[in-house]
Curated annotation (Swiss-Prot):
Belongs to the MDM10 family. Component of the ERMES/MDM complex, which serves as a molecular tether to connect the endoplasmic reticulum and mitochondria. Components of this complex are involved in the control of mitochondrial shape and protein biogenesis and may function in phospholipid exchange. mdm10 is involved in the late assembly steps of the general translocase of the mitochondrial outer membrane (TOM complex). Functions in the tom40-specific route of the assembly of outer membrane beta-barrel proteins, including the association of tom40 with the receptor tom22 and small TOM proteins. This is Mitochondrial distribution and morphology protein 10. Residues 433-450 have a biased composition (Low complexity). InterPro entries: Mdm10. Keywords: Membrane, Mitochondrion, Mitochondrion outer membrane, Transmembrane, Transmembrane beta strand. Coiled coil: none annotated. Component of the ER-mitochondria encounter structure (ERMES) or MDM complex, composed of mmm1, mdm10, mdm12 and mdm34. Associates with the mitochondrial outer membrane sorting assembly machinery SAM(core) complex. It comes from Talaromyces stipitatus (strain ATCC 10500 / CBS 375.48 / QM 6759 / NRRL 1006) (Penicillium stipitatum). Its main location: mitochondrion. It is found in: Mitochondrion outer membrane. Residues 433-454 are annotated as: Disordered. Lacks alpha-helical transmembrane segments, suggesting that it resides in the membrane via beta-sheet conformations similar to those predicted for other outer membrane proteins and porin. GO terms for biological process: establishment of mitochondrion localization; mitochondrial genome maintenance; mitochondrial outer membrane translocase complex assembly; mitochondrion-endoplasmic reticulum membrane tethering; phospholipid transport; protein insertion into mitochondrial outer membrane.
Amino acid sequence: MLEFMDYVQLAFAEATRWNQDNSYSSLTAIAESLLDFHVPERLQVHLSSLSTPHFATSYTLGTVGLIDGSVSYLFSTVPLNNTPSQSGVIPLRRLVRGYRQIEAPVPPIRNWGWDAIPSHDSSQIIDSADINQDDIVRKATLLHATLHLPPPSTLNALFQRRISPTTQITAALVSTQGPPLIKSAPSAALLAQISHDTGTFSNEYLFSTDNALFGWRGLWNIGLDPSPGKQSTDKVSLLSAGAEAYYSPISSLVGLSTGLKFTTLPAAGRALSSSSSSSPGSNPSPISSFPYTLTLTLTPLTGSLSTTYSARASPNLAFSSRFGFNVYSWESEMVAGCEIWRKSPRTQPAEADDGLDWARRKMGIVKERAAEKISALSSSSSTPQAVEESEGDSVVKIRVDQSWNVRLLWEGRVKSLLVTAGVSLGPGTFTALSSGPASPTSSSAPVAMAGAPPTSRPSYWQGVGVSILYSS
Protein backbone atom coordinates (compact mmCIF):
# COMPACT_ATOMS: atom_id res chain seq x y z
CA MET A 1 0.00 0.00 0.00
CA LEU A 2 1.25 3.44 -0.88
CA GLU A 3 2.16 5.75 1.95
CA PHE A 4 0.11 8.91 2.25
CA MET A 5 2.87 11.17 0.91
CA ASP A 6 3.35 8.92 -2.12
CA TYR A 7 -0.41 9.10 -2.68
CA VAL A 8 -0.30 12.92 -2.58
CA GLN A 9 2.62 12.96 -5.03
CA LEU A 10 0.58 10.74 -7.36
CA ALA A 11 -2.32 13.20 -7.08
CA PHE A 12 0.09 16.04 -7.91
CA ALA A 13 1.20 14.21 -11.07
CA GLU A 14 -2.42 13.66 -12.11
CA ALA A 15 -3.32 17.29 -11.44
CA THR A 16 -0.46 18.49 -13.65
CA ARG A 17 -1.14 15.78 -16.27
CA TRP A 18 2.31 14.20 -16.01
CA ASN A 19 2.19 10.57 -17.17
CA GLN A 20 4.33 8.53 -14.77
CA ASP A 21 3.66 5.33 -16.72
CA ASN A 22 5.36 6.73 -19.83
CA SER A 23 8.89 6.07 -18.53
CA TYR A 24 11.44 3.30 -18.88
CA SER A 25 11.60 3.03 -15.09
CA SER A 26 7.91 1.95 -15.15
CA LEU A 27 8.42 -0.73 -17.80
CA THR A 28 7.88 -3.62 -15.35
CA ALA A 29 5.85 -1.69 -12.75
CA ILE A 30 2.73 -3.86 -13.12
CA ALA A 31 4.59 -7.14 -12.60
CA GLU A 32 6.58 -5.70 -9.70
CA SER A 33 3.39 -4.59 -7.93
CA LEU A 34 2.07 -8.17 -8.10
CA LEU A 35 5.33 -10.03 -7.40
CA ASP A 36 7.62 -7.73 -5.39
CA PHE A 37 5.18 -6.29 -2.86
CA HIS A 38 6.58 -5.42 0.56
CA VAL A 39 5.45 -7.36 3.63
CA PRO A 40 5.60 -5.32 6.87
CA GLU A 41 7.98 -6.80 9.44
CA ARG A 42 6.82 -4.89 12.51
CA LEU A 43 4.03 -2.74 13.90
CA GLN A 44 3.72 0.68 12.26
CA VAL A 45 1.21 3.48 12.75
CA HIS A 46 0.80 6.33 10.24
CA LEU A 47 -1.09 9.55 11.01
CA SER A 48 -1.50 11.85 8.01
CA SER A 49 -3.48 14.89 7.01
CA LEU A 50 -4.08 17.04 3.95
CA SER A 51 -4.80 20.11 6.07
CA THR A 52 -5.11 22.48 3.09
CA PRO A 53 -5.23 21.89 -0.68
CA HIS A 54 -1.56 22.94 -0.77
CA PHE A 55 -0.08 21.42 2.41
CA ALA A 56 0.12 17.87 3.82
CA THR A 57 1.74 16.33 6.89
CA SER A 58 2.45 12.75 7.94
CA TYR A 59 3.80 11.13 11.11
CA THR A 60 5.01 7.53 11.40
CA LEU A 61 5.74 5.49 14.51
CA GLY A 62 7.15 1.96 14.39
CA THR A 63 8.27 -0.49 17.03
CA VAL A 64 9.75 -3.95 17.30
CA GLY A 65 12.29 -3.74 20.09
CA LEU A 66 13.39 -0.27 18.92
CA ILE A 67 11.02 2.67 18.63
CA ASP A 68 11.58 4.89 15.62
CA GLY A 69 9.53 7.13 13.39
CA SER A 70 9.49 9.92 10.85
CA VAL A 71 7.98 13.34 10.24
CA SER A 72 7.02 14.43 6.70
CA TYR A 73 5.84 17.69 5.18
CA LEU A 74 4.70 18.40 1.62
CA PHE A 75 3.82 21.63 -0.18
CA SER A 76 2.31 21.95 -3.66
CA THR A 77 1.65 25.11 -5.63
CA VAL A 78 -1.15 23.28 -7.46
CA PRO A 79 -4.29 22.97 -5.29
CA LEU A 80 -5.35 19.37 -4.75
CA ASN A 81 -9.02 20.24 -4.21
CA ASN A 82 -10.51 17.07 -5.70
CA THR A 83 -8.13 14.66 -3.95
CA PRO A 84 -9.83 12.41 -1.35
CA SER A 85 -7.73 12.65 1.80
CA GLN A 86 -9.75 10.90 4.50
CA SER A 87 -8.74 7.28 5.03
CA GLY A 88 -12.41 6.28 5.15
CA VAL A 89 -13.15 7.56 1.62
CA ILE A 90 -9.86 7.17 -0.28
CA PRO A 91 -10.41 4.57 -3.04
CA LEU A 92 -8.42 1.52 -2.01
CA ARG A 93 -7.41 0.76 -5.60
CA ARG A 94 -5.54 4.07 -5.73
CA LEU A 95 -3.47 3.13 -2.68
CA VAL A 96 -2.82 -0.52 -3.54
CA ARG A 97 -0.60 -0.89 -6.57
CA GLY A 98 -1.86 -3.88 -8.52
CA TYR A 99 -2.79 -4.55 -12.11
CA ARG A 100 -4.11 -1.37 -13.72
CA GLN A 101 -5.27 -0.58 -17.23
CA ILE A 102 -2.75 1.70 -18.95
CA GLU A 103 -4.03 4.45 -21.22
CA ALA A 104 -2.31 5.44 -24.45
CA PRO A 105 0.02 8.42 -23.79
CA VAL A 106 -1.35 11.75 -24.99
CA PRO A 107 1.28 14.02 -26.62
CA PRO A 108 1.15 17.36 -24.78
CA ILE A 109 0.41 20.57 -26.63
CA ARG A 110 3.72 22.30 -27.30
CA ASN A 111 2.75 25.88 -26.60
CA TRP A 112 6.13 27.54 -26.22
CA GLY A 113 4.50 30.65 -24.75
CA TRP A 114 3.35 28.37 -21.94
CA ASP A 115 4.25 29.74 -18.55
CA ALA A 116 2.02 27.77 -16.22
CA ILE A 117 -0.24 24.78 -15.79
CA PRO A 118 -3.87 25.41 -16.84
CA SER A 119 -6.19 24.93 -13.90
CA HIS A 120 -8.95 22.98 -15.65
CA ASP A 121 -9.76 19.45 -14.62
CA SER A 122 -7.02 16.93 -15.37
CA SER A 123 -9.45 14.30 -16.62
CA GLN A 124 -10.43 16.42 -19.63
CA ILE A 125 -8.60 16.28 -22.94
CA ILE A 126 -6.76 19.52 -23.62
CA ASP A 127 -7.74 21.48 -26.71
CA SER A 128 -5.48 24.15 -28.16
CA ALA A 129 -8.48 26.47 -28.42
CA ASP A 130 -9.26 26.09 -24.72
CA ILE A 131 -5.79 26.92 -23.41
CA ASN A 132 -6.23 30.69 -23.68
CA GLN A 133 -9.62 30.49 -21.98
CA ASP A 134 -8.46 28.60 -18.89
CA ASP A 135 -7.38 30.23 -15.68
CA ILE A 136 -3.60 30.25 -15.28
CA VAL A 137 -1.88 29.34 -12.06
CA ARG A 138 1.76 29.38 -11.09
CA LYS A 139 4.20 26.83 -12.46
CA ALA A 140 3.61 23.47 -10.82
CA THR A 141 6.12 22.97 -7.99
CA LEU A 142 6.26 20.35 -5.25
CA LEU A 143 8.41 20.36 -2.11
CA HIS A 144 8.65 17.33 0.15
CA ALA A 145 10.86 16.57 3.15
CA THR A 146 11.02 13.60 5.54
CA LEU A 147 13.07 13.39 8.73
CA HIS A 148 13.70 9.91 10.13
CA LEU A 149 14.27 9.63 13.89
CA PRO A 150 15.88 8.77 16.31
CA PRO A 151 19.56 9.70 15.72
CA PRO A 152 21.51 9.04 13.65
CA SER A 153 18.71 10.71 11.73
CA THR A 154 18.27 10.76 7.96
CA LEU A 155 16.78 13.60 5.93
CA ASN A 156 15.11 12.99 2.57
CA ALA A 157 14.15 16.01 0.48
CA LEU A 158 12.44 16.23 -2.92
CA PHE A 159 11.95 19.14 -5.33
CA GLN A 160 9.84 18.90 -8.51
CA ARG A 161 9.02 21.64 -11.00
CA ARG A 162 7.39 21.74 -14.42
CA ILE A 163 9.30 24.12 -16.68
CA SER A 164 7.33 23.38 -19.88
CA PRO A 165 4.45 21.14 -21.00
CA THR A 166 6.97 18.43 -21.92
CA THR A 167 9.75 18.95 -19.36
CA GLN A 168 10.02 18.42 -15.62
CA ILE A 169 13.04 18.74 -13.34
CA THR A 170 13.51 16.75 -10.13
CA ALA A 171 16.11 17.01 -7.38
CA ALA A 172 16.32 14.48 -4.53
CA LEU A 173 18.61 14.82 -1.51
CA VAL A 174 19.56 12.20 1.08
CA SER A 175 21.57 13.30 4.12
CA THR A 176 22.55 11.05 7.04
CA GLN A 177 23.85 12.30 10.36
CA GLY A 178 27.12 10.83 11.56
CA PRO A 179 27.56 8.88 14.82
CA PRO A 180 27.07 11.02 17.94
CA LEU A 181 30.62 10.43 19.22
CA ILE A 182 32.27 11.39 15.92
CA LYS A 183 32.28 15.06 15.01
CA SER A 184 31.92 15.05 11.26
CA ALA A 185 29.70 16.68 8.68
CA PRO A 186 26.61 14.69 7.67
CA SER A 187 27.06 12.64 4.53
CA ALA A 188 24.83 13.71 1.67
CA ALA A 189 24.05 12.66 -1.89
CA LEU A 190 22.13 14.62 -4.53
CA LEU A 191 20.29 13.15 -7.51
CA ALA A 192 19.22 15.53 -10.28
CA GLN A 193 16.93 14.47 -13.11
CA ILE A 194 15.50 16.14 -16.22
CA SER A 195 12.50 14.38 -17.77
CA HIS A 196 11.29 15.15 -21.29
CA ASP A 197 8.02 13.50 -22.38
CA THR A 198 6.49 14.10 -25.81
CA GLY A 199 4.06 11.18 -25.68
CA THR A 200 5.77 9.17 -28.40
CA PHE A 201 9.23 9.54 -26.86
CA SER A 202 10.28 9.85 -23.23
CA ASN A 203 13.84 10.70 -22.17
CA GLU A 204 15.33 11.10 -18.70
CA TYR A 205 18.79 12.47 -17.94
CA LEU A 206 20.24 11.83 -14.49
CA PHE A 207 23.25 12.87 -12.46
CA SER A 208 24.19 11.72 -8.96
CA THR A 209 26.91 13.18 -6.77
CA ASP A 210 27.53 9.67 -5.45
CA ASN A 211 30.56 8.58 -7.53
CA ALA A 212 29.63 11.26 -10.13
CA LEU A 213 27.18 8.91 -11.82
CA PHE A 214 25.67 9.95 -15.18
CA GLY A 215 22.60 8.19 -16.54
CA TRP A 216 20.05 8.17 -19.34
CA ARG A 217 16.72 6.40 -19.78
CA GLY A 218 14.61 6.40 -22.93
CA LEU A 219 11.27 4.95 -24.05
CA TRP A 220 9.71 4.84 -27.52
CA ASN A 221 6.00 4.10 -28.02
CA ILE A 222 5.88 2.52 -31.46
CA GLY A 223 3.02 3.57 -33.74
CA LEU A 224 1.61 6.26 -31.45
CA ASP A 225 -0.08 9.27 -33.05
CA PRO A 226 2.30 12.23 -32.51
CA SER A 227 -0.44 14.87 -32.91
CA PRO A 228 -0.36 17.15 -29.83
CA GLY A 229 -3.38 16.87 -27.56
CA LYS A 230 -4.87 13.95 -29.53
CA GLN A 231 -5.46 10.64 -27.80
CA SER A 232 -5.28 7.41 -29.78
CA THR A 233 -8.69 6.03 -28.82
CA ASP A 234 -8.80 3.44 -31.60
CA LYS A 235 -5.57 1.61 -30.74
CA VAL A 236 -6.17 -1.75 -29.08
CA SER A 237 -2.55 -2.36 -28.03
CA LEU A 238 0.70 -0.53 -27.43
CA LEU A 239 4.26 -1.70 -28.07
CA SER A 240 7.07 0.16 -26.28
CA ALA A 241 10.84 -0.22 -26.52
CA GLY A 242 13.37 1.38 -24.21
CA ALA A 243 16.87 1.33 -22.81
CA GLU A 244 18.98 2.83 -20.02
CA ALA A 245 22.70 3.45 -19.59
CA TYR A 246 24.85 4.57 -16.65
CA TYR A 247 28.50 5.55 -16.34
CA SER A 248 30.68 6.74 -13.46
CA PRO A 249 34.14 8.13 -14.33
CA ILE A 250 35.30 7.83 -10.71
CA SER A 251 34.49 4.17 -10.06
CA SER A 252 34.48 3.13 -13.76
CA LEU A 253 30.98 1.76 -13.26
CA VAL A 254 29.05 0.97 -16.44
CA GLY A 255 25.43 -0.16 -16.65
CA LEU A 256 23.24 -1.00 -19.62
CA SER A 257 19.82 -2.59 -20.07
CA THR A 258 17.12 -2.77 -22.75
CA GLY A 259 13.49 -3.76 -22.64
CA LEU A 260 10.24 -4.29 -24.55
CA LYS A 261 6.64 -4.04 -23.35
CA PHE A 262 3.39 -5.03 -25.01
CA THR A 263 0.11 -4.12 -23.32
CA THR A 264 -3.53 -3.99 -24.27
CA LEU A 265 -5.41 -0.68 -24.15
CA PRO A 266 -9.02 0.07 -23.10
CA ALA A 267 -10.04 0.17 -26.78
CA ALA A 268 -9.44 -3.60 -26.94
CA GLY A 269 -12.40 -4.24 -24.66
CA ARG A 270 -14.63 -1.93 -26.69
CA ALA A 271 -13.52 -3.60 -29.94
CA LEU A 272 -14.29 -7.03 -28.50
CA SER A 273 -17.79 -6.02 -27.36
CA SER A 274 -18.58 -4.45 -30.74
CA SER A 275 -17.33 -7.51 -32.65
CA SER A 276 -19.39 -9.86 -30.48
CA SER A 277 -22.55 -7.84 -31.15
CA SER A 278 -21.92 -7.77 -34.93
CA SER A 279 -22.79 -10.47 -37.45
CA PRO A 280 -21.33 -13.97 -36.98
CA GLY A 281 -19.42 -13.72 -40.27
CA SER A 282 -17.28 -10.77 -39.16
CA ASN A 283 -13.59 -11.19 -38.43
CA PRO A 284 -12.83 -11.72 -34.72
CA SER A 285 -10.61 -9.30 -32.83
CA PRO A 286 -6.96 -10.45 -32.55
CA ILE A 287 -6.80 -9.18 -28.95
CA SER A 288 -7.72 -11.43 -26.05
CA SER A 289 -10.86 -10.77 -24.03
CA PHE A 290 -8.92 -9.75 -20.90
CA PRO A 291 -6.23 -7.08 -20.37
CA TYR A 292 -2.67 -8.36 -20.23
CA THR A 293 0.91 -7.06 -20.30
CA LEU A 294 4.11 -8.71 -21.54
CA THR A 295 7.64 -7.44 -20.84
CA LEU A 296 11.13 -8.55 -21.82
CA THR A 297 14.27 -7.03 -20.25
CA LEU A 298 17.91 -7.78 -21.02
CA THR A 299 21.07 -6.71 -19.17
CA PRO A 300 23.95 -7.57 -21.54
CA LEU A 301 26.82 -6.86 -19.14
CA THR A 302 25.59 -9.28 -16.47
CA GLY A 303 23.93 -11.69 -18.90
CA SER A 304 20.53 -11.45 -17.22
CA LEU A 305 17.29 -12.04 -19.11
CA SER A 306 13.85 -11.57 -17.57
CA THR A 307 10.33 -12.01 -18.94
CA THR A 308 7.03 -11.21 -17.23
CA TYR A 309 3.39 -11.91 -18.04
CA SER A 310 0.56 -10.19 -16.17
CA ALA A 311 -3.16 -10.54 -16.86
CA ARG A 312 -6.43 -9.45 -15.32
CA ALA A 313 -8.78 -12.40 -15.57
CA SER A 314 -11.67 -10.45 -14.03
CA PRO A 315 -12.15 -7.04 -12.39
CA ASN A 316 -11.29 -8.64 -9.03
CA LEU A 317 -8.62 -11.18 -10.03
CA ALA A 318 -5.16 -10.68 -11.57
CA PHE A 319 -2.20 -13.01 -12.14
CA SER A 320 1.47 -12.41 -12.85
CA SER A 321 4.55 -14.54 -13.44
CA ARG A 322 8.23 -13.89 -14.04
CA PHE A 323 11.08 -16.01 -15.34
CA GLY A 324 14.69 -14.87 -15.01
CA PHE A 325 17.76 -16.52 -16.48
CA ASN A 326 21.49 -15.74 -16.36
CA VAL A 327 23.46 -16.90 -19.39
CA TYR A 328 26.78 -16.75 -17.51
CA SER A 329 25.93 -18.70 -14.36
CA TRP A 330 23.00 -20.71 -15.79
CA GLU A 331 20.94 -19.82 -12.75
CA SER A 332 17.23 -19.20 -13.13
CA GLU A 333 14.37 -17.79 -11.14
CA MET A 334 10.62 -18.39 -11.38
CA VAL A 335 8.06 -16.34 -9.47
CA ALA A 336 4.26 -16.40 -9.59
CA GLY A 337 1.72 -14.26 -7.81
CA CYS A 338 -1.87 -13.09 -7.83
CA GLU A 339 -4.19 -10.56 -6.23
CA ILE A 340 -7.82 -11.14 -5.24
CA TRP A 341 -10.13 -8.23 -4.50
CA ARG A 342 -13.16 -8.62 -2.28
CA LYS A 343 -16.12 -6.34 -1.74
CA SER A 344 -18.34 -6.97 1.26
CA PRO A 345 -22.05 -7.01 0.48
CA ARG A 346 -23.83 -3.87 1.54
CA THR A 347 -27.55 -3.48 1.70
CA GLN A 348 -29.01 -0.55 -0.16
CA PRO A 349 -30.61 2.11 2.06
CA ALA A 350 -34.34 1.70 2.35
CA GLU A 351 -36.43 4.32 0.60
CA ALA A 352 -38.72 6.51 2.62
CA ASP A 353 -42.26 5.14 2.74
CA ASP A 354 -44.76 7.84 1.87
CA GLY A 355 -47.79 5.52 2.23
CA LEU A 356 -48.84 5.88 -1.42
CA ASP A 357 -47.80 2.45 -2.73
CA TRP A 358 -51.44 1.35 -2.91
CA ALA A 359 -52.23 4.27 -5.21
CA ARG A 360 -49.24 3.52 -7.46
CA ARG A 361 -50.32 -0.13 -7.76
CA LYS A 362 -53.82 0.90 -8.83
CA MET A 363 -52.39 3.33 -11.39
CA GLY A 364 -49.89 0.73 -12.71
CA ILE A 365 -46.76 2.82 -12.24
CA VAL A 366 -44.92 0.45 -9.88
CA LYS A 367 -43.40 -1.54 -12.74
CA GLU A 368 -42.38 1.67 -14.51
CA ARG A 369 -40.49 2.89 -11.44
CA ALA A 370 -38.75 -0.49 -11.08
CA ALA A 371 -37.71 -0.40 -14.74
CA GLU A 372 -36.30 3.10 -14.29
CA LYS A 373 -34.25 1.96 -11.29
CA ILE A 374 -32.85 -1.05 -13.19
CA SER A 375 -31.92 1.03 -16.26
CA ALA A 376 -30.26 3.70 -14.11
CA LEU A 377 -28.28 1.07 -12.20
CA SER A 378 -27.11 -0.70 -15.37
CA SER A 379 -26.09 2.54 -17.07
CA SER A 380 -24.06 3.69 -14.07
CA SER A 381 -22.20 0.40 -13.60
CA SER A 382 -21.58 -0.63 -17.22
CA THR A 383 -19.09 2.06 -18.16
CA PRO A 384 -15.44 0.96 -18.39
CA GLN A 385 -14.40 3.74 -16.03
CA ALA A 386 -16.78 2.47 -13.36
CA VAL A 387 -15.54 -1.09 -13.77
CA GLU A 388 -11.89 0.02 -13.68
CA GLU A 389 -12.30 2.13 -10.55
CA SER A 390 -14.85 -0.07 -8.77
CA GLU A 391 -14.13 0.09 -5.10
CA GLY A 392 -13.05 -2.97 -3.13
CA ASP A 393 -12.99 -3.34 0.61
CA SER A 394 -9.91 -5.56 0.78
CA VAL A 395 -7.31 -7.34 -1.33
CA VAL A 396 -5.20 -10.44 -0.78
CA LYS A 397 -1.84 -10.83 -2.51
CA ILE A 398 0.07 -14.11 -2.73
CA ARG A 399 3.57 -14.64 -4.08
CA VAL A 400 5.64 -17.83 -4.33
CA ASP A 401 8.97 -18.63 -6.02
CA GLN A 402 10.74 -21.81 -7.11
CA SER A 403 12.22 -22.35 -3.63
CA TRP A 404 8.80 -22.17 -1.93
CA ASN A 405 9.37 -18.79 -0.35
CA VAL A 406 5.84 -17.53 0.21
CA ARG A 407 4.57 -14.02 0.90
CA LEU A 408 0.98 -13.39 1.94
CA LEU A 409 -0.40 -9.86 2.27
CA TRP A 410 -3.82 -8.55 3.24
CA GLU A 411 -4.74 -4.90 2.74
CA GLY A 412 -8.14 -3.51 3.56
CA ARG A 413 -10.27 -1.02 5.40
CA VAL A 414 -11.39 -1.48 8.99
CA LYS A 415 -13.87 1.26 9.89
CA SER A 416 -11.92 4.45 9.08
CA LEU A 417 -8.50 2.79 9.27
CA LEU A 418 -6.42 1.38 6.42
CA VAL A 419 -4.71 -1.79 7.62
CA THR A 420 -1.91 -3.81 6.03
CA ALA A 421 -0.97 -7.20 7.49
CA GLY A 422 1.40 -9.77 6.03
CA VAL A 423 3.56 -12.77 6.68
CA SER A 424 6.63 -14.15 4.90
CA LEU A 425 7.45 -17.86 5.05
CA GLY A 426 10.16 -19.95 3.42
CA PRO A 427 12.86 -22.58 3.96
CA GLY A 428 15.96 -21.25 5.71
CA THR A 429 18.30 -23.16 3.38
CA PHE A 430 17.42 -20.97 0.40
CA THR A 431 20.64 -19.75 -1.24
CA ALA A 432 19.72 -19.57 -4.91
CA LEU A 433 20.83 -16.42 -6.72
CA SER A 434 22.36 -14.99 -3.53
CA SER A 435 25.93 -15.77 -4.61
CA GLY A 436 25.53 -15.33 -8.37
CA PRO A 437 25.82 -12.22 -10.51
CA ALA A 438 23.33 -9.43 -9.96
CA SER A 439 20.29 -9.52 -12.18
CA PRO A 440 17.25 -7.29 -12.69
CA THR A 441 15.08 -9.96 -11.04
CA SER A 442 17.23 -10.48 -7.98
CA SER A 443 15.21 -7.93 -6.02
CA SER A 444 12.37 -10.43 -5.72
CA ALA A 445 14.40 -12.56 -3.32
CA PRO A 446 13.50 -12.02 0.33
CA VAL A 447 15.59 -9.30 1.91
CA ALA A 448 16.13 -11.30 5.08
CA MET A 449 17.75 -14.13 3.12
CA ALA A 450 19.86 -12.21 0.60
CA GLY A 451 23.53 -12.81 1.22
CA ALA A 452 22.88 -14.90 4.34
CA PRO A 453 25.04 -17.99 4.85
CA PRO A 454 23.30 -21.34 4.46
CA THR A 455 22.15 -23.02 7.61
CA SER A 456 21.41 -26.66 8.25
CA ARG A 457 18.39 -25.89 10.42
CA PRO A 458 15.22 -25.34 8.39
CA SER A 459 13.62 -22.09 9.53
CA TYR A 460 10.37 -21.34 7.74
CA TRP A 461 9.43 -18.18 9.63
CA GLN A 462 10.87 -15.05 8.04
CA GLY A 463 8.74 -12.12 9.15
CA VAL A 464 5.32 -10.80 10.09
CA GLY A 465 4.02 -7.29 10.60
CA VAL A 466 1.07 -4.90 10.65
CA SER A 467 0.80 -1.34 9.33
CA ILE A 468 -2.09 1.02 10.19
CA LEU A 469 -2.84 4.27 8.35
CA TYR A 470 -5.24 7.02 9.37
CA SER A 471 -5.59 10.28 7.46
CA SER A 472 -7.88 13.27 7.66
